[in-house]
């Protein structure tokens, strides 16, 4: 199995919708989550690049579909954050349309990483995203981000609760904790991405 070097990931393009994306070939893994769930921080931690994906304390800064190339034909996709964002309704609807089109029509999408703040997991939109992926037979890795915000006992309890709740999705849904600050969960994320890029069977969940 090839272990991809995520530190060599480079920015390719930003697109307002799928019509402006590169050809629908190769393998793409998309990162999705509510605004301020820590998507950009996770991408920067994964690639060990401080500013590959722009981070912001203002929710909703990721307004475009941002593509990054890990290796030829292997791409990471930073999708527009969903949920809360201080933007006009018209703009929000445009993001949602772009997000929906990408998820429904992009044939090279082979894995979905859904990021949720460990303190506020499984909001309605998060569950919709996972239900959609399961219905489309796309495997999901849920990262419970900002896990450093909780003490060890509370963190383990949240992980157990979300894993039990995720059984209801009846799909290939793996749940792990993640902290960009402490670099916790990065190896599990890399292993999962490696398996998707190599077209392998799902792995067993890691222990906390």
UniProtKB/Swiss-Prot annotation:
GO cellular component: cytosol
Binding site for Mg(2+): 40, 62
CDD domains tied to this protein: YihA_EngB
Cofactor field: Mg(2+)
Pfam family for this entry, one: MMR_HSR1
GO BP terms in the entry: division septum assembly
Key word Endoplasmic reticulum present: no
Example of a GO MF term: metal ion binding
UniProt xrefs under InterPro entries: G_ENGB_dom, GTP-bd, GTP-bd_ribosome_bio_YsxC, P-loop_NTPase
Gene3D superfamilies in alphabetical order: P-loop containing nucleotide triphosphate hydrolases
Residues covered by the EngB-type G domain: 25-199
SUPFAM superfamilies: P-loop containing nucleoside triphosphate hydrolases
Residues binding GTP: 33-40, 60-64, 78-81, 145-148, 178-180
Keyword annotations from UniProtKB, A to Z: Cell cycle, Cell division, GTP-binding, Magnesium, Metal-binding, Nucleotide-binding, Septation
Family per record: Belongs to the TRAFAC class TrmE-Era-EngA-EngB-Septin-like GTPase superfamily. EngB GTPase family.
Role description: Necessary for normal cell division and for the maintenance of normal septation.
Name of the protein in its database record: Probable GTP-binding protein EngB
Organism of derivation: Enterobacter sp. (strain 638)
